[in-house]
């Protein structure tokens, strides 16, 4: 609510999307009852680990969320023994990699800074243990005498620092909340960003019983917010993107066409191939698509039997009628954690919460054996034949390597659909958002080509019209084009951009120069 009061987009991700309360409070836009999500996957009385809620926010405004949280739960005098500050960021141990290892060792040994800096800058972002092998393959360093005794010693020592702690750093997204003053529970220091930070990592704060909130900056959320703003400014349409219908046929037609550059989660070459073959027609199809395109299902060849059954080339293989309602939507293929939980509960009669504990145990070899020893007698007692139990067990055991949380996929599918909706119905505003916030995997030149294919023109850089961001302009004929931003100029600073905008309008070059 604090974020939305500031017009900052927020959305839940992860298993928290399976909570009906999260949905009713507006934290998650996905209805867990409509999509068969299970609360037990997120939180249950039997769960040993503390649940956490991951919140996606606009990447461009993530620190504003931090400020809101600390303003509400923090204390400006947090260093005082009487402080009631109940929140802080979480630390993580920054370990040595190649560049900082060679720099720190070189400085400690008193080697020439210019020489050490040249070596460090020449190294790619690699493990410190690979420094020597990498340096041998860099021709630009042949002029340096890397075999000199002190230099060779520095390289050898730097390699030995691989993976060792360098210093404490702020975790990129974790904030910890407490029901009392944090100084009574953990050591706290001020981090480089000016926020209080507990000196425990993410695992340590959970071990002492503190609740962790992950605030993740997502560029697609900033892209969507930018597009919605441009739609309102140019088209005078107050679009509530969170309320658009999830059954818009033109949107699914665009996804099926595989022209998905810029669309969240489905723009990679592999995903474009999959959406073309799967041909999503519903929101559930998007959830399945996102879940299937994971390393596990791809390596386990789970996609082919699903597609064959989906398109009627082969019948769906559902091992037992009791499992039909669980596996029908995925054509008999086990894709989701929630399906495993339901299968175990159905065949053994235990609660969903207990079934989730069994699912978690499948992640280790020891746990698999323990579950196996329990599962066969429990399912036999419920009247299932040994052949059926064995087939189901083989599926459950294999699932440990390729399962995915349906609630997580559903939370991802929502911005996937929303970004596809914007690209379908408001392409200029969508392209302006993508070019401004760069949420995807492709360079801007490809997105500019995509804009042209969508019929969206590109207006050149203009000191009188270009702003800090890419914006939509409408011509006299009603056509939309995107104006290139001043920030696209290489090397330009924020101060220079502000100065240019403040000094408008400019009559000519000499006026601009003055």
Predicted regions and their residues:
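Noncatalytic, beta-rich nucleic-acid-contacting surfaces in large DNA/RNA-processing enzymes
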Residues: 1-514
